[in-house]
Amino acid sequence: MGSGWSSEEEERQPLLGPGLGPAPGAARRGREATAVLPAAGPNPGRVYGRRWLVLLLFSLLAFAQGLVWNTWGPIQNSARQAYGFSGWDIALLVLWGPIGFLPCFAFMWLLDKRGLRVTVLLTSFLMVLGTGLRCIPVSDLALKKRLIHGGQILNGLAGPTVMNAAPFLSTTWFSADERATATAIASMLSYLGGACAFLVGPLVVPAPNGTAPLLAAESSRAHIKDRIETVLYAEFGVVCLIFSATLAYFPPRPPLPPSVAAASQRLSYRRSFCRLLSNLRFLMIALAYAIPLGVFAGWSGVLDLILTPVHVSQVDAGWIGFWSIVGGCVVGIAMARFADFIRGMLKLILLLLFSGATLSSTWFTLTCLNSITHLPLTTVTLYASCILLGVFLNSSVPIFFELFVETVYPVPEGITCGVVTFLSNMFMGVLLFFVTFYHTELSWFNWCLPGSCLLSLLLILCFRESYDRLYLDVVVSV
């Protein structure tokens, strides 16, 4: 393990040399950002090759958390037959994800006070417990269902770290011209894990045959249960490997900071919340992120339920969900790399992405109402509209994260992103709560997509961007 910046107190102390400051006449935000500069210490700016290993381990953890969270939605028909799950159970299994964000602020405090290593180890340990709980062999179906729900709750508690810590990791380990890319990779891998659940589940677990005779149905139920347990054991093994790797090597931070922003002093936990809640610009852009991304996350979790009324099979629904998220991950990383090369364009990128998201979500919603709109309802149109929607929305996540941090700097990255992901999961949880009661007819859920995307587009248009952290790295360090 690399040597750390030795103590908690030292972590919050200035590390930059004297004489660094903004030119006379700089804007007020530039002066506020520069006020957090240290008074003495070595000049930072070194990056280490091990940063990619740290990013890989964190990304694999995020991938596994997304995979475990989305285990049940893509195989909901099979789970109903194997374990006697109801539509309420399936919605609740997905709902444990946003419920796991309720102690989000405790994880933000831990990340701010104890750093990456302690927080990541606790997160991975919770995932080991959760996936292990689902694998306990019991014959009582009622007890098995409780164990599965308990495992999903523990995995949901890992969500705050994998969703919030990406900008913190990128600032801690990466230089200014790599931060957006690192944030995109770390944050997108959780979505990619959820996408792989759409692929792995339906391919490994067979769909039930509702027309089979009674004896054949019992045999099919046992076979489906065995295949589901195979998936559960495989996920448990993957999580254990990742936990072992992070336990063996996951340094809290590099010996020297990679940039001026990484070395600068940050606001305290209490002052950070006061700054966030009093910043109207931050609240505006936070809602622009939380509402559509929360709606889309909940919609993706029950995509199979939504597509069943239009006669889309479990396997086809899985492929649609898979490619929509994979496309968003690829485009998101590409957009972040573009943002690293051409700085100060985050708002424009978001406007383009949400214009596309509004159009594609409207197309999908109207297509599902083909009896009224007479639009062609084919596999091609469903694939195209869902994939485009996933590409536009998922690829906006790392761009939003970078804009949040720039807007409220010097608030710590973990606290900033923790607040917005908490809001996103709150909206997701509210929608999934309604799904547990109104799961027989979900056309209303489809209309939430274009409405939330349009609202977000209007909020982004009214938002006035600023780049306080970038000012430190590009101007002050010159």
From Swiss-Prot:
Q: Which residues lie on this side of the membrane: Cytoplasmic?
A: 1-51, 111-117, 174-184, 251-281, 336-347, 406-414, 464-478
The ranges of region (Disordered) come to 1-27
Q: Tell me which UniProt keywords the record has, alphabetically.
A: Glycoprotein, Lysosome, Membrane, Transmembrane, Transmembrane helix, Transport
Read off the InterPro entries from this record: FLVCR1-2_SLC49-like, MFS_trans_sf, SLC49A4-like
The membrane topology of this protein is: Multi-pass membrane protein
Give any single GO term for biological process.
Answer: pyridoxine transport
List, alphabetically, the SUPFAM superfamilies matched: MFS general substrate transporter (SSF103473)
The residue numbers the entry assigns to motif Di-leucine motif are 15-16
Spell out where the chain crosses the membrane: 52-72, 90-110, 118-138, 153-173, 185-205, 230-250, 282-302, 315-335, 348-368, 385-405, 415-435, 443-463
A Gene Ontology cellular component where this protein is annotated is:
lysosomal membrane
Its annotated compartments are: Lysosome membrane
CDD domains in UniProt: MFS_DIRC2
Q: How is it modified after translation?
A: Cleaved in lysosomes by cathepsin L between Leu-214 and Ala-261, generating a N-glycosylated N-terminal and a non-glycosylated C-terminal fragment.
Sites carrying a glycan are 209
Where is this protein primarily located? membrane
Give the Lumenal compartment stretches of this protein. Answer: 73-89, 139-152, 206-229, 303-314, 369-384, 436-442
Catalytic activity reported: pyridoxine(out) + n H(+)(out) = pyridoxine(in) + n H(+)(in)
Q: What does this protein do?
A: Mediates H(+)-dependent pyridoxine transport.
Name the protein family.
Answer: Belongs to the major facilitator superfamily.
Q: What is this protein called?
A: Solute carrier family 49 member 4
The scientific name of the source species is Mus musculus (Mouse)
Which lineage do the record's taxonomy fields give for this organism? Eukaryota, Metazoa, Chordata, Craniata, Vertebrata
